[in-house]
Regions:
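Elongated, amphipathic alpha-helical interaction scaffolds
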Residues: 1-205
Length: 205
């Protein structure tokens, strides 16, 4: 038995990434995930429970919902086993984050076109199972809004990243980037007797 928490349980994942005392871990993970695109300096955790707009509409509870210092919204989900319509659920979660922005504008009395000046929403799904749906067929699936014929960016307001851990097969020695080291640690944390990479990555000290 390893010495460390199981990040694939609800308690373990939220303790690792979803607490004030551990938010440096979340920031480091996201910065490694988006290396070369942007740098996050701080995050503010938001209410994870999003109620339905009416009594007959179901709400949702995110694993982690936070806003960065430059106002990017992040939903980070851990799914330990396959469930039907997982990709559809992640799209629904993103829509709730946009609705939350709309409510903020409504309460401030703003009107169009300000109402539609959304900030970007990123949904990061860590999947500890082999997908059965055709949408996810490799370790990292990166989805953005693009124009089909030119593949040029249509809008930066919505992004999905699906990380399917069974497709990640690198050994400790083969991990080179900070992101690869994160994935290795997450995948094997429950059975590790010691954390690797502490000499190269101080966040694991």
């Amino acid at each position: 038995m390893g010495r460390y928490i199981n990040p694939f349980t609800d308690w373990g994942f939220k303790r690792l990434f979803g607490q004030e005392f551990s938010k440096d871990l979340l920031i480091n993970f996201l910065n490694d995930l988006f290396e070369g695109e942007f740098q996050i300096k701080d995050v503010t955790f938001k209410d994870k429970e999003q109620l339905g707009d009416t009594n007959d509409l179901r709400g949702c509870i995110f694993d982690i919902y936070c806003v960065t210092d430059d106002d990017k919204h992040f939903i980070v989900e851990m799914q330990n086993r396959w469930v039907p319509f997982f990709v559809n659920r992640s799209i629904y979660y993103a829509s709730k984050a946009f609705v939350a922005q709309r409510k903020k504008f409504d309460e401030a009395g703003d009107r169009t076109p300000v109402l539609y000046q959304f900030v970007p929403v990123y949904v990061v799904c860590i999947m500890n199972f082999m997908p059965k749906e055709h949408e996810v067929t490799k370790f990292r699936t990166d989805v953005a809004l693009r124009e089909k014929s030119s593949d040029s960016m249509f809008s930066d307001k919505l992004r999905f990243i699906y990380l399917s851990l069974p497709f990640f097969d690198k050994s400790e020695e083969e991990c080179e980037t900070g992101f690869e080291k994160w994935i290795y640690v997450l995948k094997y944390m429950e059975v590790l007797e010691r954390l690797p990479f502490t000499a190269q990555k101080k966040i694991f000290d």
